[in-house]
Structure formats: structure tokens, C-alpha cells
Amino acid sequence: MVQWKRLCQLHYLWALGCYMLLATVALKLSFRLKCDSDHLGLESRESQSQYCRNILYNFLKLPAKRSINCSGVTRGDQEAVLQAILNNLEVKKKREPFTDTHYLSLTRDCEHFKAERKFIQFPLSKEEVEFPIAYSMVIHEKIENFERLLRAVYAPQNIYCVHVDEKSPETFKEAVKAIISCFPNVFIASKLVRVVYASWSRVQADLNCMEDLLQSSVPWKYFLNTCGTDFPIKSNAEMVQALKMLNGRNSMESEVPPKHKETRWKYHFEVVRDTLHLTNKKKDPPPYNLTMFTGNAYIVASRDFVQHVLKNPKSQQLIEWVKDTYSPDEHLWATLQRARWMPGSVPNHPKYDISDMTSIARLVKWQGHEGDIDKGAPYAPCSGIHQRAICVYGAGDLNWMLQNHHLLANKFDPKVDDNALQCLEEYLRYKAIYGTEL
């Protein structure tokens, strides 16, 4: 009896795989015969364009797998939000993320994997084709988070460098390799480092990807760096439009530092057993008498900016100087953004300070700033949980989030609130195909 059940399961999986493969072929054939990028262009209002978008959305839609009203959640309907929160509490114990083994099995057939996971495998507009984006993705755990992030930002004209922490488990590394082997424009960084929290290694991971991305044949225009707890809140088309509006400028947090942060670069820090430690050794002043600024690890940088990070001798001197500081990613980029020799930079004057809310790089809710907006707080309390004083978003944060101009937000975790992620996935997929909100 057990053998019969296993045989039935195998036949079912084989049939499902065949169906998905045939559906993919049928979709591609349909598009070759009737649809092209002109028909998908959001500026076109022809009936043929609507027909093509309907076909595409029916095949690629990512509806939430639970009985929740994602349209209501993203619009801020309180009843829909409450239902999503209650639903998340009911199923949280049952929800188990996909494992490394799951992805190793699923990616044995790449076409089946891409079809089942509903990756968008062709450009959705000429404008997007002509404006490729480069991504650095620095990850160390939670394979499902990585795969869902990749699916959300993936477009065939873009280029993606994935840096896997050298100390990550081998099964995780193998699962990442298996996933990216299915895509010609996704690759693992040629040099991997052992990433230590708040140390130089986090910056080095991004620099390694920058070098590899510049050597690729893809003529990308802008660089975005991401981590495994990020997720986009804009479609690729919206990102392209936002990046075009920068007109060669960069967008990253860069502000005059508070006094308590100056210790981070005034003293030497060293890594001991994968932990960063403060020493009593004072550092020399920064090169070229540079004024130090603070920001965060995540940037939106032009290709010229990235080239100057790696090639300009002045940039290289600053890089060497910050290597033994605390959390250098939070002052290196911010300081380079105010350096006169850097393309797209801005002057040192405080009037040019850019906060995390003004920059488009990353939307983060800091626990210390949450509160009553009517009483002056920048944003309402987190509807999820907090991790290292940062909000891990819940469904109740989505409406606020989608009203902001940022390209990506942080942090997300399906084990905390998968409904938040599922509704965001549904929203973004609808926006990508139709250009309008869910």
C-alpha cells in the first residue's frame, strides 16, 4: 500500500512538472505569435496590450496562499489588516520555510523551477531593457528569503552578484549555487569572505561584487546592494524611472555624525574569534582631512561612482583607513558621497545632509523613532517584532511602506509574518504587469 502511494505521488509530480513545462512553452509561443514588448508597454492603451497583460498576469500572478485580502491590506483597510494578523498567528506554528534540500531538488530541472516559482523571464518594456541595474546580494542563511528576494527583483536584462558568507553551511552554499545556475545573469562573487558583524568584511563583500559587476558585459547604469532580509517595494519599471530621475547622482544616507558615533573611527578595532573588539589605540585623522559623515550600509550608486570607489587613489586611501573601524559600511559610503572627487557627490555643508527617509536606498523603521505621528514621530509603531532595534515588518506596515519613495525596505522574515511578504509579492507582481496598484 505504501509503495502504491509513493508511485502515485511520483506520477503526480511528473504530471505536474510536464504541465508546468507545457504551460511555459505555450506562454512563450503565445507571446511570439501575438505579443511583444510594445504590447506590454504600460503607455500603450490598445486592446491587444490589455489582452497580452491579462495572459501574462494569469500565468505569473503570485496570489497569497492564505485567505487574506491583500488588496485591502496594501490599501490600509483595518479589517483586512486585522484578518491578516490573526491569520498569521493561527498558522505561524505550521509555517516551515523551504529548506536547502527543497531547492536542491527543485532546481534539478531549471525550466520547471523557474515556471513553478514564477520568475519573470523576459523584459516587460523597452525602457527597462535600455536601463539595466546591477545588484550585490550579500547573504549567509535562510535560503527561502534569498530565493524570494531574487524572484522579486529579477529581470533578465539586469545583472546579479551573490556573495555567500564563507562560513555559511555547505548545504546552503550548494542550494544557492543550484538556484543561480538556472539564470545566465546571476553569479556567485569570484572572491568570498568570512563576514563578521560590524567589521570591514561586510564592505569587502560588496566591493568584491562591485569588481565582478564592472567586469561583466552588461552595461548597467546603477548599483544597488542588498541583504537577505531586504525586499523591494517598487517594481523594476518604477526603479528604472526613479534611477533615471537621479540623472547620474547617487542616493544614500549621509549626515553629520552625532558625537557618540565618533569612537567608531577614532579608535582601532580588531576582530577576535569572529567578534569585533574596541582597543585603546587611537587612529590618525582621516586622509585629506576629510570630514566624516554617517549613514547606513545600503546605497544607490551610479556606475561612475562605483568605478571611482575601486580605481580612484583618494578613495582607495580612505578605504584603507576605515578598515579597522567599527561598522565602516555606515561611514565609508556616507563620507565618499561628500567627497568632491566622487561622481554624483554633494557638498559638505549640512544643507546637503541626506537622512535615511530622504534617500531612496532603504526604508527602515527604527524602534527608537517609532511613536505617535501626531506628536512628531516619523512613523507609527512596528506591527511585527523588533530585531536589533529594527522593525521586522508585519502586514500592518505595508500601507505606510508603499506610500514611501524608497526602492527597498528592511527587514522581512517569513517566520515572523509571511502574510506581509505574500501580500507584497502579490502587489508587486500586479504592479509589474499592469502598472497600477492592486
Swiss-Prot record:
Protein location? Golgi apparatus membrane
* Summary of the tissues where the protein is detected: Primarily expressed in mucus-secreting tissues. Expressed in colon, kidney, small intestine, trachea, and stomach, where mucin is produced.
The domain of life for this entry's organism is: Eukaryota
Question: Is Glycosyltransferase set as a keyword in this record?
Answer: yes
Provide the alphabetized UniProt keywords.
Disulfide bond, Glycoprotein, Glycosyltransferase, Golgi apparatus, Membrane, Signal-anchor, Transferase, Transmembrane, Transmembrane helix
Residues of this chain annotated as glycosylated in UniProt: N289
One Pfam family from the UniProt entry? Branch
- Please give the record's induction comment: By all-trans retinoic acid (ATRA), TNF and IL13/interleukin-13. Strongly down-regulated in colorectal cancer.
What's the stated role of this polypeptide?
Answer: Glycosyltransferase that can synthesize all known mucin beta 6 N-acetylglucosaminides. Mediates core 2 and core 4 O-glycan branching, 2 important steps in mucin-type biosynthesis. Also has I-branching enzyme activity by converting linear into branched poly-N-acetyllactosaminoglycans, leading to introduce the blood group I antigen during embryonic development.
Entry protein name = Beta-1,3-galactosyl-O-glycosyl-glycoprotein beta-1,6-N-acetylglucosaminyltransferase 3
Q: What is the lineage of its organism?
A: Eukaryota, Metazoa, Chordata, Craniata, Vertebrata
